């Protein structure tokens, strides 16, 4: 009967151990993020597992947001904005989405944390000429400034990197 040499058994154990270590090393970060309450969308589509810097204003100042912050922002978006802004589109006005291009093109631009918070506190039409009645005014009693900043961070990150966010047209899904 064939008996493997000691070194052959050792290599087998070493390979098995390395495989287990490698699997643990690749699975552990995702498991840790999930345990911290990070939404998989934030990891997979917003590509944030740690922190991200986002523009606070047009003077180049930035603020750091964590994956947990963006998860909270996503939750706020789902609870308060998703009915009109599915996937970054704008159902009441499909010509103006939450794409980065459209956010930058608004008057005034809405492509920073501060400008999005200001818009949500006092919504204006896309050209800035009049009050917007299609977007609800968000009072301090409804969402705090910190919550609005977190919501704005989610929108800006999605607009920058999420596939399909704010696309201009949807494929016809009818058979």
From Swiss-Prot:
Domain of life the protein comes from: Bacteria
Residues annotated for heme c binding in this entry: 81, 84-85, 135
GO-annotated cellular components: photosystem II; plasma membrane-derived thylakoid membrane
Cofactor remark: Binds 1 heme c group covalently per monomer.
Statement: the UniProt record of this protein carries the keyword Lipid metabolism: no
GO terms for biological process, alphabetical: photosynthesis; respiratory electron transport chain
Required co-factors: heme c
Keyword Iron attributed: yes
Gene3D superfamilies: Cytochrome c-like domain
InterPro entries noted in UniProt: Cyt_c-like_dom, Cyt_c-like_dom_sf, Cytochrom_C550, PsbV_cyt_c550-like
Membrane topology, record value: Peripheral membrane protein
Stretch forming the signal peptide: 1-34
Predominant subcellular localization, coarse grouping: membrane
Induction text: Present at very low levels (at protein level).
UniProt keyword annotations, A-Z: Electron transport, Heme, Iron, Membrane, Metal-binding, Photosynthesis, Photosystem II, Signal, Thylakoid, Transport
Single GO molecular function: iron ion binding
Subcellular location: Cellular thylakoid membrane
Family statement: Belongs to the cytochrome c family. PsbV subfamily.
Role of this protein: Probable low-potential cytochrome c, can partially replace cytochrome c-550 (PsbV) function.
Record-given protein name: Cytochrome c-550-like protein
Organism: Thermosynechococcus vestitus (strain NIES-2133 / IAM M-273 / BP-1)
Organism placement in taxonomy: Bacteria, Bacillati, Cyanobacteriota, Cyanophyceae, Acaryochloridales
